[in-house]
């Protein structure tokens, strides 16, 4: 299909087919990230930079104030990196929340507007929680593979704090910026919005190349929901991307995206109610959407690992959302039928583990990690009924 139709159908494809528990008590649920840190400490560096090739409308401190039009595109960049272990004060979730208020204003907090309301809603009850990263910590000597993380629609760069810090502790430099529209902070569900976030990914790769602790010859793009779709756009257009990770993204090919020509490995996580056949039937059912070939079905010339998390709903692919008080209040509508919120949290931890092993296998070329990916979930210790996996090896691309 044309990209315009693809974008219009995004919300329908993303949300369709879900079933939820109606009577689960969520008052005692507490999300716990149980994966252990790697051999490194974690540093966080915040870089306030701008893309002068694109213009942007800056928000004022009040919705009634006029905005600056024609300014360069601000990209508050969060860099998580391996650092020597230390006893220095670590970040709190509240420290991360404070960063979000200066996403586009760089040092001058914006106290209202859509991004701030979003943060206040989903960070309620989390501000005192300790994180792993030490702000501006010393860098660990060496060069490490790069992971560019693309957030979901209109989301801050911090929506998966645990995942980003976890990967940094395991020897990756993880870089993220907010999901923003083409000309303003609010993301738009259209072609310019999708292309803008994809361009941000390439901008961050340019930035990563200049860092003293990166191995820019090994780069992965990862994204959640809308961010996974924009990561696909970036990977198709920027040949520096060596691997792709999708966290429950709506993947349908269109425009200049040709999955049957892609040769990089893809790790695609999805909810249990999504299957390759279901997505393909959506494509063929013209009452649902007018879609191009399903990306996963057409991804034949790059390795494809498709991991279905059976106990997980779409919103549970973010640790930040699972931690929030709002999630606990509304959780009954989130958990898939016959599964508990605790099982959804366990599934998130396994998602982080499989992400790590995928990156180890394809960016660090680790044979043990490659074997992990080939084993069944049960052989890797995953509890029964939480995960289903299919691994399809790449076939040769005809020339």
Locations of regions flagged by a protein language model:
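Alpha/beta-hydrolase-fold serine-hydrolase catalytic core, especially in secreted/extracellular enzymes
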Residues: 25-43, 52, 59-62, 84, ...
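Alpha/beta-hydrolase active-site loop
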Residues: 159, 190-213, 233
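Gly/Ala-rich beta-loop-alpha elbow adjacent to hydrolase catalytic centers
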Residues: 223-227, 231
């Amino acid at each position: 299909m044309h990209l315009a139709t693809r974008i219009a159908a995004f919300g329908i494809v993303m949300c369709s087919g879900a079933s939820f528990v109606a009577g689960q008590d969520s008052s005692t649920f507490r999300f716990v990230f149980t994966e252990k840190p790697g051999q490194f400490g974690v540093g966080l560096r915040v870089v306030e930079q701008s893309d002068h090739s694109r213009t942007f409308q800056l928000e004022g401190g009040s919705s009634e104030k006029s905005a600056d039009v024609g300014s360069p595109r601000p990209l508050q960049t969060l860099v998580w990196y391996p650092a020597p272990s230390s006893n220095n004060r670590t970040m709190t979730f509240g420290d991360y929340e404070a960063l979000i208020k200066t996403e586009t204003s760089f040092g001058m907090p914006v106290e209202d507007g859509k991004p701030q309301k979003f943060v206040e809603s989903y960070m309620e009850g989390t501000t005192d929680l300790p994180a792993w990263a030490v702000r501006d910590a010393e860098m660990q000597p060496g060069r490490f593979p790069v992971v560019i993380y693309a957030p979901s629609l209109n989301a801050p760069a911090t929506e998966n704090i645990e995942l980003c810090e976890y990967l940094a502790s395991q020897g990756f430099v993880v870089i993220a910026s907010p999901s923003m529209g083409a000309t303003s902070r609010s993301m738009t569900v259209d072609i310019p919005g999708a292309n803008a976030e994809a361009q941000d990914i390439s901008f961050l790769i340019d930035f990563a190349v200049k860092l003293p602790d990166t191995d820019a010859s090994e780069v992965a793009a990862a994204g959640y929901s809308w961010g996974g779709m924009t990561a696909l756009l970036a990977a198709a257009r920027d040949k520096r991307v060596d691997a792709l990770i999708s966290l429950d993204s709506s993947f349908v090919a269109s425009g200049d995206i040709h999955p049957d020509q892609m040769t990089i490995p893809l790790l695609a996580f999805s909810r249990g109610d999504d299957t390759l056949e279901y997505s393909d039937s959506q494509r063929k059912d013209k009452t649902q959407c007018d879609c191009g070939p399903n990306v996963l079905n057409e991804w034949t010339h790059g390795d494809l690992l498709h991991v279905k998390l059976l106990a997980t709903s779409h919103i549970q692919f973010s640790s930040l959302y699972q931690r929030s008080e709002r999630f606990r209040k509304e959780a009954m509508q989130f958990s898939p039928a016959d599964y508990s919120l605790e099982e959804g949290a366990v599934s998130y931890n396994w998602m982080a583990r499989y992400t790590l092993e995928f990156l180890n296998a394809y960016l660090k070329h680790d044979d043990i990690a490659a074997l992990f990916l080939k084993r069944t979930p049960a052989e890797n210790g995953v509890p029964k009924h939480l995960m289903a996996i299919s691994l399809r090896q790449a076939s040769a691309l005809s020339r």
